[in-house]
Amino acid sequence: MNVTASLSRRPLGCLKAGLCQSLIRGYATAVAASTTQSTGALPDHNFFRIADKHTKKTRTAFAVFTPPKSPTTLPPSSVVTKSKAFKIANSKLPPLMTKPPSDPMPLLTQQQIARMDPTGARTALFSKARHAARVGDVLMVTHRRGGEPFAGVCLAIRRSGIDTAILLRNHLGKVGVEMWYKIYNKNVAGIEIIKRRAKRARRAKLMYMRQPKHDMGSVEQYVFAWKKMRKVLSSKGLTGGVGGGGGKQKGQESKKKN
C-alpha cells in the first residue's frame, strides 16, 4: 500500500519532455504541402502607374530607353590610325622645365651687382685685369652726401660679391687712419686712381705697411699733384688745345698792341 502511494506521487515532468521531443521529430520529418497559385488569379497592381492629366493616358514611373537603331560609331577625326600615331610620336614635344640650380646664390649675387652697378665700371675697376686697381695704389673715394673725399694707400681688396670692399690707409694729423669702403655702396659717388704703384706687389694684403719702416705716410702730395694735372688737362680742353687756342690768343694780343 505504501509503495503504490509513493509511485502515484512522482512528478510527471519527464513525460512532458518526452512528448515534446516526439512532436519536434514529427514536425521535422513531415513533408510540406506545395501550394501553387495561378498567376492569373493575382490582382493587377497599379502602384507604379501614373495617369497623365492632359492625355489621360497611363504611364509608368520608370524610364524605359529603347535600344539605338544602329550601333554608335565614332567620327573619323577621333579615330587614331597607325600613321597618325606615328606622327604624334615624332612630333616635337614641349621643352621640359629646366632643373633649378643647386646653389642659387651666384645668380642672386649677379642680379644685385647688375642693379647696383648698371654700367659695370666699378666691377671692371677692381677686376683682376692689368688695367684694374691693385693693392699699393693710391685711391681716392668721393662721398655722395658731400664732405671731403678720403684718399689713401690701398692695403687690401676683399672680393666677396656684392660686399666687395677696399681698405685705404692715410695719415691725418700724423695719426694713421684706415677706412673700409664698399665699392657697390650707394653713398660712394666715385673712386679714382691717384697714383699707381711702380712695381706690382707680391702680396694680396699689404698689412706690413702699418709698420713705421714701411709706412707710406700722408698721400696729400699725390692728391695735390693729381688735381693740378687734371686742372691743366681740363683747361687745355676748354681752350681747344695747345695749337689752336694759344695761336688765337697771340693773334688777338698782337692786334691790340698795333
From Swiss-Prot:
Recorded superkingdom: Eukaryota
Chain positions covered by the region annotation Disordered: 235-258
Broad class of where this protein is predominantly found: mitochondrion
UniProt record similarity statement: Belongs to the bacterial ribosomal protein bL19 family.
Subunit structure comment from the entry: Component of the mitochondrial large ribosomal subunit (mt-LSU). Mature N.crassa 74S mitochondrial ribosomes consist of a small (37S) and a large (54S) subunit. The 37S small subunit contains a 16S ribosomal RNA (16S mt-rRNA) and 32 different proteins. The 54S large subunit contains a 23S rRNA (23S mt-rRNA) and 42 different proteins.
The protein's role, per its UniProt record: Component of the mitochondrial ribosome (mitoribosome), a dedicated translation machinery responsible for the synthesis of mitochondrial genome-encoded proteins, including at least some of the essential transmembrane subunits of the mitochondrial respiratory chain. The mitoribosomes are attached to the mitochondrial inner membrane and translation products are cotranslationally integrated into the membrane.
Protein name as catalogued: Large ribosomal subunit protein bL19m
